[in-house]
Amino acid sequence: DSYPRIKRVHIRFQNEARLSAPLSGHFYGLSRSSSAGDFNCLAYLQDGSNGKLFCSMLLQLTDPLDCSEETILSIKEIPEAAPRGLIDTSPISNLAMADAEEAGFVVSGRGLVRSEDCDNAGNLKAPAYMGKASDSVPNLWTHLMGDEQVSDSEGGAVAEFKKTFYGVFKEGDVFTVLSGLVEARGKIQRFAHLFFRQGDGQLIMSAEAISVRFNLLTRKASEIQPEMLKRLESKKLNLNS
């Protein structure tokens, strides 16, 4: 259990990586004077042949890595990695389960933390949180739009994603995921997910995502249709109270 603990993650997906594109991965420590806030590490994937950025990930580790001078850079050197749409302070981090349900969050997932998803210390591995957030989206979408809105020609593409940890799930924990729509306008939708531990009701992780409405045939972003927007607006979270 000596690995650095991840506290916050902010991911941006800048470009689509096509099949057979050569990938080059990089990991750096961030200088304290880099205007990156509390983030102290940066990882990114780029095209190994031309340097085109595919995705980037800012991390805040509770135990910063001891990086050599050659592996420390400023966020200003890769401005595309800086937060863009998810930069405000979100009220969802302070919500208890009952308050979240009152605000319009719905149950989108439940389960048991299994041993095969945990590390040697019995903690749920970081990638598993992302997977469970992804698994909750179809259930949220059914709540928002119904099964009849499933389409082979249109979907969504996540452009930005952030998650904040307040604790850790352990092997044997029972969890509940609550999800909701924060905003819908133009070509974008903004979703939120809350991961609670059953029993004591502790909020373990909150996550938010900005998704772009995406035409799967043209591979381009598209406007949310007026009828769909109307239905989405009627199911939007009430986070003002």
Where are the regions a protein language model picked out?
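Catalytic strand-loop segment that frames the active site of acyl-thioester-processing enzymes
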Residues: D1, G85-D147
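Short loop/turn motifs at secondary-structure junctions and domain boundaries
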Residues: I6, V107-G109, V158, R185-K187, ...
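Hydrophobic, proline/glycine-rich low-complexity stretches
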Residues: D1-P22, S134-V137, W141, M145-Q149, ...
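Small beta-barrel nucleic-acid-binding modules, principally OB-folds
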Residues: S2-E16, S153-K170
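Hydrophobic pocket/interface hotspot
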Residues: A121-N123, S179, R219
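HotDog/MaoC-like acyl-thioester-processing domains
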Residues: F13-P22, Y28-D99, F165-E171, L181-S241
